Amino acid sequence: MSGGGNLLTLERDHFKYLFLTSYFDLKDNEHVPSEPMAFIRNYLNCTFDLLDDAVLMNYFNYLQSMQLKHLVGSTSTNIFKFVKPQFRFVCDRTTVDILEFDTRMYIKPGTPVYATNLFTSNPRKMMAFLYAEFGKVFKNKIFVNINNYGCVLAGSAGFLFDDAYVDWNGVRMCAAPRLDNNMHPFRLYLLGEDMAKHFVDNNILPPHPSNAKTRKINNSMFMLKNFYKGLPLFKSKYTVVNSTKIVTRKPNDIFNEIDKELNGNCPFIKFIQRDYIFDAQFPPDLLDLLNEYMTKSSIMKIITKFVIEENPAMSGEMSREIILDRYSVDNYRKLYIKMEITNQFPVMYDHESSYIFVSKDFLQLKGTMNAFYAPKQRILSILAVNRLFGATETIDFHPNLLVYRQSSPPVRLTGDVYVVDKNEKVFLVKHVFSNTVPAYLLIRGDYESSSDLKSLRDLNPWVQNTLLKLLIPDSVQ
């Protein structure tokens, strides 16, 4: 829509579409209404001379009104048009990071980190420009660490390029896949208040490529992406058979819903938590719009029912599946959808097996993610690959949970048997429960093995660590 002087404007009730297309990495705008697309297209292309400044400021106020997390305040539309800090974080990594030292440099805990709107495909070619700006702020550069991705002074000031979104509060334990972020995947981050203030006080843009025929803000070397987080977004195209909304802040309400479905004819549930729900207090119309989409990076857990004792094979409904979608802090949707090959879900980088729902038949052991006790059967088990989900209470491990089973002669065990404590006659026995869940039983009594006893060193680390937590609780924090 055009305003006075033929400048493009945008109605407030269309701000949700601007947020959808600019905060996320949305490849396909096909489902966005045509009316706001002229403004949105020019906003994304940074052709601000065609846009009404009043609308830009109103949109910034819209972001403030939803209390968008880490947002840097401004009273000028220059925050859209030049390289500016837009989100402020504090690097709070208090433990030792095991990093992939290709692009990342050491940053002191407590250092303020500002995410700017500048993106590039080649940080090395931006270094001369940024180092010159750095030199305007810091004259003494004795303790500077420089590489092709940044320049850091004494671990607490400078600049660097990294992914569009970095968890500055987390501990990165291994190399994570870089998100496919169009042609300019690297974002400029400013370290320290002095560097941020320099870019706030001055309207700065990098020099344009020498072969550029026009001086467009977005070009082959760099571009501005305003108030952009970069989570990859796709349109949901499920065939919904039925749906129910649930409003609650109580996890037990959700566990009851899962329990009810798993005790029906449903063999599993896909539980999805959107990875942006804590970013803001999203207005209802924006939440409704986001419900039509899904981020690839959202967290998805496949939750199955656990059967301890043998029973006839469960006949589950296989033409449809159930999704429990947490789309805001206290809002969920339970969707019954057709099971179709075209259904798209969040990417599961976690290559573990599905989660096992903690039913009323057993209790999870405190401090573990894969150990439980079944009072009725008086068995204690450690899952070999799965994790437990949905416990409303836990119990402490105590040796009394291991009932001593007397037998003369000793019971002869087949399969893999591991010695835990030879004097106390405690063993770990490989076991597969009736619905094909691999596990180990922790047993105590008069047993012997039909083959050589195995060492605990032969166990996979997932089981080994849990066993250590149970038997030596202070050994693993």
UniProtKB/Swiss-Prot annotation:
Localization in the cell: Host cytoplasm; Host nucleus; Virion
GO cellular component term of the entry, any: host cell cytoplasm
**Key word Lipoprotein present:** no
Q: For this UniProt entry, what is the primary localization, expressed as one broad class?
A: host cell
What are the boundaries of the signal sequence? none
* Keywords from the UniProt entry: Host cytoplasm, Host nucleus, Virion
Q: What does this protein do?
A: Required for occlusion-derived virus (ODV) envelopment and subsequent embedding of virions into polyhedra.
Protein's name in the database: Protein AC142
From which source organism is this entry? Autographa californica nuclear polyhedrosis virus
